[in-house]
Amino acid sequence: MSLIRFQDILRDGIQSLLGTNPSAQEIIDAYPTAHLIGNDSIQTAGGTFFDLFAKKGRNEWEEIEKLITYFKKHGVKQSALIRGDFLFGYDPQPYDVIREMVFEYAKLGINILQSFHGMNDPRALIGVIKAVQEAQSNGYDIIAQGTICIEDNPNITIQKCLEFAVELIDMGHHGFYLKSASGRLDPKFVYILTSNLYDKFPDQNITIHVHSTYGKAPACYIAAAMAATERGRIITMDVQHPALSGSTSQPSMNKMVGLIRNHPDKKINSNAPKLDAGAIKGSMRSLFSLRFRYRDYESSYSSELVGAMHDARAAGGASATLKSIPGLVENLGRLLGRNHEMADWNTIQIAIYKMQSKILKNLGEPTQVTPYAANTTGQAAISLWHQLEGRDLYYTLYPGIINYLVGLHGKIPESIDKALVKKAIKVKNLDRTEEYIISTDRPNAMPLAKEILIQAGVKNPTTRQMLSSVLIGDLDHVLQCYFKTNKPQQAPELPFYAQEPSSDEKKYIARDGKTQIRDIRDAIKAIGGTSVLQEIAERALHLKQLSDNLYIFPLGEESLKDKWYNANILKLSLLLGSISKILENDGFTVLQSLSMQRSWGKNNIHDCIKDSVDKKGAGLYDFVVEALADCKFKINS
């Protein structure tokens, strides 16, 4: 078997790109061939796949069980990302809650818990590993992988990571999970760290997880592969199906196989994972369609925004949580606007991230991963608000930042601004910073949750109901699920052009008495529907990112930039150039075909393509048109 293996990080694709908005059934329906591709494992749970299911009005346990049970039925090794003591929430929990949660997931069929704490504090991981060991002794097939959070950060050094690795293994973790939620990472750092981990821990394998936000993930993965294959060791890379890859998620499994096979070192290119291309293709259209339906939840690309995020070490999507703060976006839009017009969301985000890069040092450079990422960005937004209204940057502190500053979330960096710590201590009415309380030393929470549920009308509360009550903190939601009165969020309505056309029986007939009158819906369906529109949009974005030199290519594979660029140009040319023929083959008359492609009016195929492409980034459609024209000019000349 190949030394280089893949984990399909499905959960994070849905979370990072689509905001955990699709239901479990939508995910399953869109990815029918996941188990056939040949990946070593699939991450099906964890992260926001609990609280956000609930916030969307869904019964979180039904959603989780549906996903895990489906993949278990197909014999898939499954993992879940778990936030140590924080589980799938934003506050540390006592051991009785942790134990019951771990046992529930073990019973469902989760095999690997990738357990992390953003500041690499081992105290916050004690509960999960203890519960996993108890589950193992009860016969469950489950392990806890020890996570080391990494990024370009003065708090994160090779030496500190190695010291933390010793603690992880001593605690009983099995293998290492190198996690970079921000994607701000140096491939050289990855190579040195993985080399040292393999040398110092010869019995432990490594999985690496890097987001694609800043284009550094492929080079970091190859750096880890070099360290592994030089030693004949296994390395697992977190990848996405091509239709869920890129942007703020992870690299495409197809792209990574290409990089591995193209690598000049035989030790690497001979260890490419063997994936089933037919199985990958088998879910391409349905996943692109899912991504199209939930496209409004994806961040829009601009080089200026990415630059601001990069300087802030921002994890993609952290700013989305700001929209839930009453009045914040409206006030920032007003204060940043010009000529009595509100600033758009892109402008607001850029300003927030510029502020974030400014305050990181005062905050002690917290690692940009949950819950620190959302809390840092939340403080940046509030500090920007204060600055624009002439107040001190830290006039008020974001609630999550207060908890971090006083030690309630774990380790506090030495470099933190002591004045901010004093302010947070005062806000919390404390005398000093708090010592982090290990989960086993916290008072049990399940008995109180049970009592509250009984008082609310649940006669015999289940373990799952008690866990939801504690973790989500929304008693009304738990009761609604119990009484089956919860109202799950409905899927977004598609734009008119992407909706199902009228049936033949309902179509009007032209004056000639025989020609069916067809509208834009028929034309879009004929060319491939929303899946083709989304594929065009993703390829357009990829072209722009390559043009902006977003991607860092591994040494010896720099030529792939031109190959990837030209391959996208060719595919886009074929997709766009075949429209007339497709319409003709589908029975459109010449006049109907011309009408559907006219450039002098609205509601034509190219307007629909423009709408799809510009959702990925303002002005992206015009960029693609110019790129295609430039390519034709070069060919003709």
Q: Predicted regions span which residues?
A:
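Short, small-residue-enriched loops and turns at beta-alpha junctions
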Residues: D12, S16-L17, F50-F53, D85-P92, ...
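Terminal or standalone catalytic/regulatory effector modules within metabolic enzymes
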Residues: R11, H35-L36, D40-F53, S302-S637
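Conserved, mostly hydrophobic/aromatic
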Residues: G13, S115, F176, A228
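Surface-exposed amphipathic alpha-helices with a cationic face
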Residues: I64-K72, I126-Y140, T194-P202, V257, ...
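N-terminal amphipathic alpha-helix/helix-capping segment at the start of soluble metabolic enzymes
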Residues: M1-L17
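Catalytic alpha/beta core domains of metabolic enzymes, predominantly
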Residues: A181-M355, I359-R391
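Hydrophobic faces of well-ordered beta-strands that scaffold small-molecule active sites
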Residues: R5-D8, I42-T44, V76-R83, L113-Q114, ...
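Active-site beta->alpha loop and helix N-cap motifs at the rims of alpha/beta catalytic domains
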Residues: G46-A131, A135, I143-F164
